[in-house]
Amino acid sequence: MEVFQDYAYYYNLFYADKDYRTEAETVSGILKKYNAKISTIINFGCGTGRHDMELEKLGYYCNGIDMSQWMIDIAKENAKAEGRNITFEVADVREYKAEKKYDAFISLFHVMSYQ
């Protein structure tokens, strides 16, 4: 989707004030409330990977999926800049088939509105 090219470029700037850390802590709290053994998360619609990086800081292994190559490229750059070991993949979440099991999946922000 070509529309995401410019959006990806400005995404981090648009959401510079977004509190990803608190959102990740909220997600973690919800996951722990229902299952304390969750350690692997797949994030559908990861965008530039900010939630994934914050979740990794909380001890989770994350795999970020987004349909935009531009978003994934920036997510990889962001993770590398912060020294984070996160896997990011380009895929359409409607057709994605995971090659391994995950303990939980998340889809944050307004991902479904793009489908």
Q: Each PLM stretch: what is its role?
A:
Residues 1-37:
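Conserved class I S-adenosyl-L-methionine
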Residues 36-39, 84, 100:
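Structured loop/turn residues at beta-strand edges in well-structured enzyme cores
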Residues 42, 49-95:
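Class I SAM-dependent methyltransferase SAM/SAH-binding core
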Residues 97-104:
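A short acidic, Gly/Pro-enriched loop at the edge of an enzyme's catalytic core
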